[in-house]
Amino acid sequence: MSPVAGAKFVRTPLQLYRYLLRCCRLLPSEAMQKHYQHAIRQSYNSHVDEDDPQRIQMIIQRAISDADWILNKYTKKK
């Protein structure tokens, strides 16, 4: 299950972008949040002209699973 509600409703690149930025708010330090926000913006800009629906869905699925992994890594209870 995704740490941020709404992952299953992500259908478009813009929805993915907003979802990933919301995920950044859960990271522990401000520097880490800024780093991942920048990476998300860069990735969005590099894929904004993608028009193949299958490729877009593949990118969305991969980005959500990567975000889940990162959040689980940095927000584990010790």
UniProtKB/Swiss-Prot annotation:
Superkingdom of the organism of origin: Eukaryota
InterPro entries: Complex1_LYR_dom, Complex1_LYR_LYRM9, Complex_I_LYR
Family: Belongs to the complex I LYR family. LYRM9 subfamily.
Protein name, per record: LYR motif-containing protein 9
Species assigned in the record: Danio rerio (Zebrafish)
